[in-house]
C-alpha cells in the first residue's frame, strides 16, 4: 500500500527560486520524438479528435459511454494519464490569412468584400474558439529507451481504444508539443512560434526560450502571464450524480482555457485490498458503536445513518470491482483560464464556478498553489496538487471530454456554422482521400444556393478551373458575374454551339486502351437513346466493331478531326446485318435528324477557367444524352488540365438522370450510363479534380447499386432538408442516428448536415440577403 499512497501525493521537486522565466517551466529535457523528461518522470503526448456524442441517440450515447469506459480500463497501471482540453480563441491574424480573401484589384473584389464580411460576421457570432484534445501519459522509467518502449505500447493501446469510438489519435512531435505550450504561454502570438531542435542544440540555446512568456508572476489566487492574468481552479466537491455534459459545458465558455483530468488507474489487487480495509474499518466502527449502546442497555437502537451509508458505499464499490468490470481510479480535475485583466478574470471565475454549481459540483481556487496548479493542468505529465478523488471507471467516464466533431481544415472555405458548438465550419475537400461528393435536398432547401456558394468561394479565392453542367439554367448569371463563360447548347439552333460526342483527347482512358473506354461511353450513349433493356448482346458487339472502324485512322497520331456520330451512323449503314441498321435507325434522329446537335465537330474553343454548359434548351428527349456528352467533354478537359497542372472542380446538377432511363420516366435503372459516371468519379481524383453531384431525388438515385456505392464512398456530403423516404435511405446508408437526421427533417433553407470524411456535423448557413452575391445566387421567385 505504500506505493498506492505515494500515487495520491503531489509530485514536487525540491523547492528553489527560479532565476528566470525559463526556469519556471518544469521541463528537464526534450527528445526529437516528443518525449519529455519532467521531475524524474518521462511523458509523451498524443492528440485525439472529437466524436459526435452530444447529437447521438440515447442508445448510441450509451454505446459510446461504455466504449469510453473500456478505454479507461485499458490505461496502463503504474502510469498517470492526463486528458487535456485546450480552448484558444481564433487568432485574428491567422484567421485573416487562412479564411479571408485578399483583394485582387479586379471587378470581383466587390464579391470578395461581401464574402469576407459574411465570414467575419459569422465568426463574431460564433464561439470563435478552437478546441484541441490531448492525452499525456507519464511514468517513472530508468532510461529514455525504456520509456520509449513503454510509450510505443501505450500509443498502440490508445489508438485501438479510441478508434472504437470513431475517434482518431495522432502522436505529436517535439515541435507540436512545444507549439502547444507556446500557444498557451503566449496567447495571440501563435503565428510567431519557431523551433528547430538541431539549431537549438548547435547554438547551445535553451529550448524553453521559444515557448516562455515575457514574464510570469504567481500571486495568492492568480498568476500574471505576459499581458494576461490567469487563475487555476480544481474540482473539490463532486455531486452524487454528475452530468456527462459538465466538462463540455465548462469548455463552451468563450475564453482561452485549459482543463485537465488526471487519471491514475489502481491495480485490482491493491484496489480490492484498500476497499476491504475500508469495509473492515467501518465494521469496526459499527461494532464499537453497538458495544457502547449495549453498555447503556440500549439493544434496539438503529445503526447511525452515516455509518450505514459508509458501509453500503464500500460494499457497492467492492461489488463494482468484483462483478461489474469496474476499476478503481484516482482522479483530479483542474482548470486554468486566462483574461485580459483581473476584473474580467474574477467575472470568468464566478461564471465557471456557477456552471459547476448548476451540476452540483464545486470548483475552488487554489490559493498559494497557483504555480503547482498551473504545472498540473498543463500537458506535461505532472500532478502537483493533492486533491485526488477515488472513483470507479464509470464515475470517471462521466467526466466526458467528447461533444461534437468539428470541421476546421487549413486552407478551406466556409460552409456555415456548427449547429452544436457554434464554431465555423471550414472544409478543404482537397485534403480528403476522395474529394468527390453530393449536395442533396428537396426543392427550396437551398441546395442550389449551397452549390453556388462553393463555386463562388472557389472562383474568388483560387485559380482552379470550374465547370458546371446546368440543366435548369440556374447558374448563368452568377458565372458571368464571376468572369466565366456560359455555353448554351440548343437543339433548335443549327448555327449555335456544338460539342462532338465522339471527341477524344490524348491520354483518354487512364492508361488503358482509349478505344475501350470510348466504346463504353458510346454504349452508355446508346443506352440513353434506346433504353437500358433494349440493347441486345449482338448489338453491343456491332457497336464496338463500328467504333473501332471510325477511330482507326484518328488514333494513329490524334491529328485531324475526330469522327462524329454521323460517321458512326454511316459505318453502321454500310453493314449488311439488320441489327446494324436497327442501331443506325435509333441514331438517325440524333445524326441527320432534328436533334443532331452532338453530331457536329466541336466549335467551342474557350479558355475561360469558369465554364457553364446550359443545356436547358435540349428538351426532355436530349437532356439525359446531353448530360452524358457533357460529362465526356468534361473528362477530356480534366485530362488536358492534368497535363497542364491545373485543378478542376466539376458540378453536375440533376445527376439523378445518370441513373434513370433516357425517356425520363425515372423507373428503369441504366447500366452503362451509371458505370461511365462511376469511372469518371474514380478517375477524377487521380487527375486532380473533384466532381459534385446535385440532386433532390436521393431515393431514385439509390435504386442503382452504383449510386449507392458512390454515396457510401463519398467523403463529402451536404444534406439539406430531405423528404421522408430520402431521409430514411440516407440514415441507413450513413449509419446516422435519429438525432442527427432530425437536422434534415423540416429544416429551414440552408440548414442540414455536412459529412466530411468520418465527421457528420449539423450546420446552419444563412446568407445575408442585402448583398450582391445573394442576389446572384438566389433562385427564389420574387427575389431580384
Residue spans for each PLM region:
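The conserved Walker
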Residues: 431, 443
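Extended, folded cores of ATP/NTP-driven motor/assembly subunits in large transport
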Residues: 1-402
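Hydrophobic anchor at the beta1->P-loop junction of P-loop NTPases
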Residues: 439
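Hydrophobic positions on the alpha1 helix immediately C-terminal to the Walker A/P-loop
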Residues: 450
Amino acid at each position: 500500500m505504500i506505493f498506492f499512497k505515494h500515487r495520491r501525493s503531489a509530485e514536487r521537486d525540491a523547492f528553489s527560486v527560479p532565476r528566470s522565466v525559463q526556469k519556471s517551466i518544469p521541463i528537464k529535457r526534450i527528445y526529437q520524438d516528443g518525449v519529455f523528461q519532467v521531475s524524474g518522470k518521462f511523458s509523451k503526448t498524443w492528440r485525439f479528435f472529437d466524436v459526435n456524442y452530444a447529437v447521438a441517440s440515447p442508445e448510441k450515447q450509451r454505446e459510446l459511454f461504455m466504449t469510453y469506459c473500456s478505454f479507461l480500463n485499458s490505461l496502463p497501471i503504474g502510469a498517470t494519464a492526463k486528458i487535456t482540453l485546450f480552448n484558444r480563441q481564433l487568432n485574428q491574424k491567422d484567421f485573416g490569412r487562412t479564411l479571408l480573401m485578399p483583394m485582387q484589384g479586379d471587378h470581383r473584389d466587390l464579391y470578395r468584400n461581401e464574402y469576407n464580411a459574411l465570414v467575419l460576421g459569422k465568426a463574431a457570432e460564433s464561439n470563435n474558439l478552437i478546441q484541441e484534445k490531448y492525452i499525456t501519459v507519464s511514468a517513472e522509467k530508468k532510461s529514455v529507451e525504456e520509456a520509449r518502449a513503454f510509450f510505443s505500447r501505450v500509443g498502440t493501446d490508445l489508438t485501438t481504444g479510441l478508434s472504437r469510438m470513431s475517434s482518431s489519435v495522432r502522436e505529436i512531435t517535439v515541435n507540436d508539443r512545444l507549439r502547444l505550450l507556446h500557444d498557451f504561454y503566449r496567447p495571440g502570438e501563435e503565428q510567431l512560434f519557431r523551433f528547430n531542435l538541431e539549431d537549438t542544440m548547435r547554438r547551445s540555446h535553451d529550448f524553453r526560450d521559444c515557448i516562455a512568456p515575457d514574464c510570469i508572476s504567481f500571486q495568492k489566487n492568480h498568476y500574471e502571464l505576459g499581458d494576461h492574468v490567469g487563475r487555476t481552479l480544481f474540482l473539490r466537491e463532486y455531486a452524487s450524480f454528475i452530468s456527462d455534459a459538465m466538462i463540455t459545458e465548462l469548455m463552451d465558455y468563450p475564453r482561452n482555457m485549459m482543463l485537465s483530468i488526471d487519471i491514475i488507474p489502481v491495480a485490482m489487487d491493491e484496489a480490492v485490498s484498500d476497499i476491504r480495509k475500508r469495509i473492515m474499518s467501518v465494521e469496526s466502527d459499527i461494532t464499537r458503536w453497538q458495544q457502547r449502546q449495549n453498555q447503556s442497555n440500549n439493544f434496539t437502537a438503529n445503526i447511525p445513518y452515516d455509518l450505514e451509508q459508509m458501509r453500503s458505499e464500500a460494499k457497492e464499490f467492492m461489488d463494482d470491482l468484483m462483478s461489474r468490470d469496474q476499476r478503481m481510479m484516482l482522479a483530479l480535475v483542474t482548470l486554468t483560464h486566462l483574461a485580459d485583466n483581473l476584473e474580467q478574470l474574477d467575472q470568468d471565475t464566478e461564471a465557471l464556478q456557477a456552471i459547476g454549481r448548476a451540476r452540483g459540483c464545486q470548483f475552488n481556487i487554489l490559493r498559494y498553489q497557483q504555480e503547482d496548479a498551473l504545472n498540473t493542468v498543463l500537458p506535461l505529465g505532472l500532478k502537483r496538487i493533492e486533491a485526488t478523488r477515488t472513483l470507479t471507471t464509470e464515475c470517471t467516464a462521466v467526466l466526458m471530454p467528447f461533444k461534437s466533431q468539428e470541421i476546421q481544415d487549413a486552407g478551406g472555405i466556409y460552409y456555415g456554422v456548427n449547429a452544436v458548438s457554434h464554431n465555423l465550419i471550414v472544409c478543404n475537400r482537397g485534403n480528403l482521400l476522395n474529394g468527390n461528393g453530393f449536395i442533396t435536398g428537396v426543392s427550396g432547401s437551398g441546395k442550389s444556393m449551397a452549390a453556388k456558394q462553393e463555386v463562388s468561394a472557389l472562383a474568388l479565392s483560387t485559380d482552379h478551373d470550374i465547370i458546371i453542367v446546368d440543366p435548369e439554367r440556374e447558374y448563368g448569371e452568377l458565372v458571368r458575374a464571376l468572369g466565366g463563360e456560359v455555353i448554351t447548347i440548343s437543339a433548335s439552333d443549327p448555327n449555335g454551339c456544338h460539342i462532338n460526342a465522339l471527341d477524344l483527347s490524348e491520354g483518354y482512358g487512364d492508361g488503358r486502351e482509349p478505344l475501350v473506354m470510348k466504346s463504353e461511353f458510346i454504349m452508355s450513349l446508346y443506352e440513353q437513346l434506346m433504353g437500358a433493356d433494349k440493347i441486345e448482346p449482338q448489338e453491343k458487339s456491332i457497336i464496338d466493331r463500328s467504333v473501332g472502324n471510325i477511330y482507326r485512322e484518328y488514333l494513329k497520331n490524334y491529328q485531324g478531326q475526330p469522327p462524329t456520330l454521323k460517321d458512326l451512323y454511316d459505318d453502321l449503314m454500310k453493314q449488311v446485318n439488320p441489327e446494324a441498321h436497327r442501331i443506325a435507325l435509333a441514331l438517325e434522329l440524333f445524326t441527320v435528324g432534328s436533334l443532331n446537335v452532338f453530331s457536329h465537330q466541336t466549335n467551342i474553343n474557350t479558355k475561360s477557367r469558369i465554364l457553364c454548359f446550359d443545356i436547358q434548351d435540349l428538351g426532355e428527349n436530349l437532356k439525359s444524352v446531353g448530360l452524358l456528352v457533357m460529362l465526356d467533354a468534361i473528362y477530356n478537359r480534366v485530362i488536358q488540365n492534368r497535363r497542364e497542372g491545373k485543378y478542376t472542380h466539376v458540378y453536375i446538377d440533376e445527376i439523378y438522370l445518370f441513373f434513370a432511363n433516357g425517356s425520363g420516366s425515372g423507373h428503369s435503372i441504366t447500366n452503362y450510363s451509371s458505370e461511365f459516371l462511376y469511372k469518371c468519379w474514380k478517375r477524377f481524383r487521380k487527375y486532380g479534380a473533384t466532381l459534385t453531384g446535385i440532386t433532390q431525388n436521393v431515393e431514385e438515385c439509390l435504386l442503382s447499386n452504383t449510386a449507392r456505392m458512390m454515396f457510401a464512398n463519398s467523403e463529402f456530403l451536404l444534406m439539406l432538408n430531405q423528404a421522408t423516404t430520402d431521409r430514411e435511405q440516407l440514415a441507413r446508408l450513413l449509419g446516422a442516428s435519429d438525432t442527427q437526421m432530425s437536422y434534415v427533417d423540416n429544416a429551414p433553407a440552408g440548414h442540414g448536415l455536412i459529412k466530411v470524411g468520418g465527421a457528420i456535423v449539423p450546420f446552419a448557413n444563412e446568407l445575408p440577403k442585402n448583398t450582391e452575391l445573394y442576389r446572384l445566387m438566389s433562385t427564389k421567385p420574387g427575389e431580384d
